[in-house]
């Protein structure tokens, strides 16, 4: 049973993907209109490969789900192929933080640890007993912080 579960949509990722789709569709139509069949034969395979690549990235990173149980914090991106778990017993501390804009989104090595994020700048930072730090992006920093604190108190 989960004591906390929340899925944050990757709003920025979705918006940027939509923008890229529009740009590629308009660009493709213009190139086909100006270049005819010769251009179509050269351009369409590239467009299809780019569309497939974009679809894979969106499927993998369109959201971040955080589940907290008595035993662990479980993260999963998008369709669930990319996951990470943190046993509650391994966590030393938790605090709310605000990421800088240049930390970006996705899974990133940042100064002092790792970041797991799909949208926005708010996060919690957990420090493990082995001194490693991880930031988990969220649009519910207070609720997520309270849920982790509750799980930590329950494990003591």
Give the location of each predicted region.
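N-terminal membrane-targeting/pre-transmembrane regions
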Residues: 1-39, 115, 121-123, 133, ...
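Short hydrophobic/aromatic segments of transmembrane alpha-helices and their interfaces
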Residues: 49, 56-57, 127
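Hydrophobic alpha-helical transmembrane segments
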Residues: 38-49
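Transmembrane-cytosolic junction motif
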Residues: 56-72, 76
